[in-house]
A protein has these predicted regions:
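Charged, glycine-rich intrinsically disordered N-terminal tails and low-complexity linkers that flank
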Residues: 1-109
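Accessory terminal regions of nucleic-acid processing enzymes
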Residues: 1-2, 119, 168, 199, ...
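Generic surface-pattern signal
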Residues: 52, 78, 97, 115, ...
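Catalytic cores of nuclease domains that cleave nucleic-acid phosphodiester backbones
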Residues: 90-211
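Metal-dependent nuclease catalytic regions and adjoining charged, substrate-binding loops involved
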Residues: 218-225, 230-280
Length: 280
């Protein structure tokens, strides 16, 4: 594989420059919040199904959002048959997996239909300014690849599933929609991602980011904000100026239901994340 582009493989969600694997934005940002949240909630749901209000009374006795898992679960698990617990938890795990797989399938299908429509139309409507931006299909021999490594050479327009990579190849990611507009020599970027969560992404959470970002909820909304700001930061390293950032949430995969959530430019938080990752 040549070193003239970064490529993406969907099966393991990996990025490569030749034989060099490049960390993803998800890996960069995921180091700043606990990854056990799914496991926590699966256990919580399992105990609720087995013990009902007896467990919920215990859960509500904690005066903080998300108690430590050991403090919460250990006293209860001591009095439950391991066989019964694992039997019920397997059902919860299977339900969780089926729901996630269905959401991933439908979400991917929705993304693909939106992209194909934009290519057929020949333009994308920027949700921030309402203007039409020309789009061009860029063929790839992989699941995705960079259009060029000289990002500032890209013409103004809209870009779908744009693969971005830091100049030092320290991190890479993909953004659903990137809009480039040059005004008085300044190259502005707007970024919009498509989200199809069953519910509107929550802004609060039962957990927080890890220090030094522990003033922020580790909520779905904030994770999206950090992710999208990371794409903007990567492009800013080439000279682009982030102007408008956000994501559009669609209900039940209905294109007419989209609601744009505008995000702030989080320069301080992103610089902390990128600086810390360089020292891992």
């Amino acid at each position: 594989m040549k070193n003239d582009k970064v490529v993406f493989f969907k099966d393991d969600h990996s990025y490569w420059l030749g034989d060099q694997q490049i960390p993803s934005v998800g890996k960069f940002t995921g180091r700043f919040y606990d990854s056990f949240e799914d496991s926590f909630w699966k256990t919580h749901i399992t105990l609720k199904r087995i013990l009902g209000e007896e467990y919920m009374d215990h859960y509500r006795s904690f005066k903080k959002f998300q108690p430590d898992a050991i403090d919460l679960f250990e006293p209860i698990l001591r009095d439950i048959s391991p066989i019964e617990f694992h039997k019920v938890k397997k059902v919860v795990d299977d339900e969780w997996t089926k729901k996630r797989n269905k959401a991933n399938f439908n979400g991917t299908k929705f993304h693909n239909l939106k992209e194909e429509k934009a290519y057929l139309d020949g333009f994308l409507i920027n949700p921030f300014d309402g203007k039409k931006y020309p789009v061009t299909r860029h063929e790839s021999e992989f699941d995705n690849e960079t259009i060029t490594l000289d990002f500032m050479s890209l013409p103004d327009g809209g870009y779908l599933e744009m693969l971005v990579v830091a100049p030092d190849f320290s991190v890479a990611g993909q953004s659903d929609e990137v809009y480039i507009e040059t005004i008085d020599g300044v190259r502005y970027i707007d970024i919009n991602d498509t989200k199809t969560n069953e519910k509107k992404p929550a802004k609060s959470s039962l957990s927080y980011y890890l220090p030094p970002l522990d003033y922020m909820y580790a909520s779905t909304h904030n994770k999206y904000a950090i992710q999208i700001n990371s794409y903007a930061h990567i492009l800013s390293l080439y000279g682009f100026v982030p102007r408008n950032l956000g994501y559009t949430h669609y209900k039940k995969y209905d294109e007419n239901s989209g609601v744009l959530q505008v995000l702030p430019v989080m320069k301080k938080e992103i610089e902390i994340i990128f600086d810390k990752n360089l020292h891992f």
